[in-house]
């Protein structure tokens, strides 16, 4: 391109070069992180020599963490709690790289990470919770069951509150329907006649876990 700027097909090569130099970033991440453990970001990337990861407290309610994921996202970010820049240089910047980034998270809560590439118009964001609670559902009986356990040890948790929700089909909002408590085996039984589409476990100050869908 530099040697033959007036070549009749030079614009084709310019467009191809622009495509090759466009940054690409795909990320898989945890929905829930155990307090004191790491948020793990699994990356596939091209042309991203550096990545800056910022983590904010989320101002959303946990049941609405996934709703309108990109709409009004900035206005729903609270205090920034972390900022880390990672060097992602590769010998051949035109080939896809993969890497895993880890960021320690200590305090319970709902958060949003925002990843940018310095000097590039590329931003990737998502939300996650820091919680000790995990919830598994079983719908083999007339009364669906929820098992609440410690996310790390798998130990059943007695006395946890399971909040259940349905989706308002008119406006897409998630509406709270009620709550039940877990027994000594960590099991809560949901009402059979209610239309329940999502559940979320809560235990005292551990109240920011993201909803689980019931199918």
Regions found by a protein language model. Name each.
Residues 1-215:
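N-terminal, cleavable Sec-dependent signal peptides of secreted/periplasmic/extracellular proteins
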């Amino acid at each position: 391109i530099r040697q033959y700027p007036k070549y009749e097909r030079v614009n084709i090569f310019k467009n191809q070069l622009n495509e090759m130099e466009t940054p690409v970033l795909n990320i898989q991440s945890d929905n829930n992180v155990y307090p004191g453990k790491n948020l793990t970001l699994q990356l596939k990337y091209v042309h991203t020599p550096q990545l800056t990861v910022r983590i904010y407290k989320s101002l959303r309610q946990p049941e609405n963490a996934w709703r309108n994921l990109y709409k009004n996202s900035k206005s729903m970010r609270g205090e920034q709690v972390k900022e880390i820049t990672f060097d992602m240089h590769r010998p051949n910047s035109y080939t896809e790289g993969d890497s895993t980034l880890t960021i320690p998270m200590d305090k319970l809560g709902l958060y949003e990470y925002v990843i940018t590439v310095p000097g590039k118009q590329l931003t990737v964001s998502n939300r996650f919770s820091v919680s000790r609670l995990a919830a598994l559902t079983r719908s083999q009986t007339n009364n669906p069951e929820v098992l609440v356990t410690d996310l790390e040890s798998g130990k059943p948790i007695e006395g946890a509150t399971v909040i259940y929700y349905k989706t308002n089909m008119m406006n897409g909002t998630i509406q709270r329907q009620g709550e039940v408590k877990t027994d000594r085996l960590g099991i809560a039984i949901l009402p059979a006649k209610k239309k329940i589409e999502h559940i979320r476990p809560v235990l005292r100050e551990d109240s920011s876990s993201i909803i689980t869908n019931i199918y």
